[in-house]
Curated annotation (Swiss-Prot):
One of its GO terms (biological process) is NAD metabolic process. PANTHER family: NAD KINASE (PTHR20275:SF0). GO terms for molecular function: ATP binding; metal ion binding; NAD binding; NAD+ kinase activity. It catalyses: NAD(+) + ATP = ADP + NADP(+) + H(+). It comes from the Bacteria. This is NAD kinase.
Length: 279
């Protein structure tokens, strides 16, 4: 049976379609691999039920997150991910376009480094019943469903009361996602290998206006303060809205034992990458 690879492209990126065709031809002619193509900028009717050798993403970090969401939805987390950057920053998509042939060739020679990126898990409860149980690679955001309205939430750490936040929202982020929205909201950048996660309030109106970093053993619980509840809040996982919830729900966060396998081709140090991409 012929081996297969999954190619996820974002055709909204200029040149993505042409480069996708080049990658497809290269895989099929040199490595005799059949390519299944998905355009993540369009609605997907069904996910292909195949055993893929690897996944290639072609776009920016947003394309990677959309492709990862497809893998998580279909419980296909073991597949190696080759992320080719056609965006600007490219923390997740860090392989240069001109290197795609080298990366593919080295994959078949088993001479590439695989970096494991762990996932953040959230469970949404209401009266003890699970409403949502999902994973995110970058971050999970809770904010008011109404424009210009704040949320009031109470935070527990390992079932112990800790803080109350009055803010525009709350970001819970992995180290991988710490360079994204959390960083823009004033949070710290964590090295991707750090085994922990962080919570950052968005525009807080409280004394506690700093981020907190927690170990992988910690479990966080957020609930709405009934006294100050104004409107339902929406939850976003890696930028995707998974619904709005009212006063009686509890959001529980923890680091998952599951991880994703990202192919690494970058030899730059963590510090050098930050300087090149952020400064």
């Amino acid at each position: 049976m012929k081996s297969k690879a999954l190619l996820c492209i974002n055709t909204l990126k200029s040149g993505a379609g042409i480069l996708g065709d080049d990658i497809k031809v290269y895989l099929e002619t040199k490595h005799f691999v059949e390519v299944v193509l998905i355009d993540v900028s369009k609605p997907l009717l069904s996910f292909p039920r195949e055993n893929f050798l690897f996944l290639i993403t072609l776009g920016g970090d947003g394309t990677v997150l959309l492709a990862v969401n497809l893998l998580l939805e279909n419980k296909n987390v073991d597949i190696p991910i080759i992320s080719i950057n056609m965006g600007k920053v490219g923390f997740l998509a860090d392989i240069k376009i001109e290197d795609f042939k080298k990366v593919i060739d080295r994959f078949f020679k088993n001479s590439l480094v695989i970096n494991k990126k762990f996932l953040l898990h959230v469970t949404v409860y209401k009266h003890g019943k699970d409403l949502i149980s999902r994973y995110a690679l970058n971050d999970i955001i809770i904010r008011s469903s109404l424009l210009n309205k704040m949320i009031h939430v109470d935070l527990k750490v390992n079932s112990e009361n800790f803080l109350s936040y009055k803010s525009d929202g709350i970001i819970v982020s992995t180290p991988t996602g710490s360079t994204g929205y959390s960083f823009s909201a004033g949070g710290p950048i964590l090295e991707a290998e750090l085994e922990g996660f962080l919570l950052t309030p968005i525009s807080p109106h409280s004394v506690y206006n700093r981020s907190f970093v927690f170990s992988k053993l910690s479990k966080l619980s957020l609930s709405f303060s009934k006294e100050y509840f104004i409107a339902p809040a929406s939850i976003f996982l890696d930028g995707i809205n998974f619904g709005s919830f009212g006063v009686d729900v509890v959001f529980e966060f923890e680091i998952s034992s599951q991880s994703l396998n990202f192919v690494s081709f970058c030899t730059d140090t963590f510090v050098k990458r930050l300087k090149n991409k952020l400064l």
